[in-house]
Regions:
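Phosphate-handling DNA/RNA-contact segment within nucleic-acid enzymes
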Residues: 51-172, 187
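N-terminal structured subdomain of primase-like DNA metabolism proteins
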Residues: 1-71, 75-80, 88-99, 133, ...
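TOPRIM fold recognition
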Residues: 1-18, 26, 30, 116-123, ...
Length: 215
């Protein structure tokens, strides 16, 4: 594992104070202090931001780390952080950064791992790490994907190997995209591709439109 990531996840940083702006952002998403602590979401020391990313991000003032749990135990060697302020580029606003060429991984809320892997209860696949944590806090088996294309590796439309241990046959799977999939072509296409990939594994897929998206 990246030694800097390993150090940041160590007990040395247990109980460390989050930047007020970062903490407010997490609470705005409905996350409890217990969830934040359990998932080891913590402030990245400013002098460690560039080191963890592997490149210089001069406009970033502060950031918090979003560690990715390995459903088999421990933590993945994977760096992803929310940065403040968000970065404005010609292609749009960037709120999250990670090392280049690091690909995507599936996000497993720890409180839900056992139910995700071993239960026949409906599974919720939620776009966004924080949203997936908020759903998991309700006691629902939940996994998160980073962006609507975050369920597969580049160059493949098969489900990400991180989902190999998740029982899907004859299981209801509710997809919760972060956007109105009915009107956005790119989101609509990605949702249908994800549904097809899940159905290929025997899942019974439903797409959930959140109330604020139905307006």
């Amino acid at each position: 594992m990246n030694p800097y990531l390993d150090f940041l996840l160590s007990r040395v940083y247990d109980g460390a104070t989050l930047h007020p702006e970062g903490l407010a952002d997490l609470r705005k998403s409905g996350l409890t202090d217990e969830t934040i602590a359990r998932q080891k979401i913590r402030a990245v020391p400013p002098d460690m931001i560039d080191t963890l990313l592997g490149f210089v991000a001069p406009k970033v003032r502060h950031a918090y780390l979003i560690p990715f749990a390995d459903p088999r135990g421990g933590w993945l060697d994977y760096v992803r952080m929310k940065v403040f302020p968000a970065l404005e580029t010609k292609k749009g606003t960037i709120k999250y950064l990670q090392p280049r060429q690091s690909g995507v991984r599936v996000y497993f809320p720890l409180v839900a791992v056992d139910a995700v892997l071993h239960s026949a209860e409906p599974l919720y696949v939620v776009e966004g790490e924080k949203k997936s944590l908020a759903v998991a806090q309700l006691g629902l088996p939940t996994v998160g994907i980073c962006g609507i294309e975050g369920w597969h590796r580049a160059g493949s439309l098969a489900l990400h190997p991180d989902l190999d241990d998740v029982g899907l046959r004859d299981r209801f799977v509710d997809l919760i995209p972060d956007g109105d999939w009915r009107w956005n072509f790119a989101v609509n296409r990605a949702v249908h591709r994800l549904a097809e990939a899940l159905e290929d594994r025997g899942a019974r897929v439903r797409v959930v439109l959140l109330p604020e998206m139905a307006k």
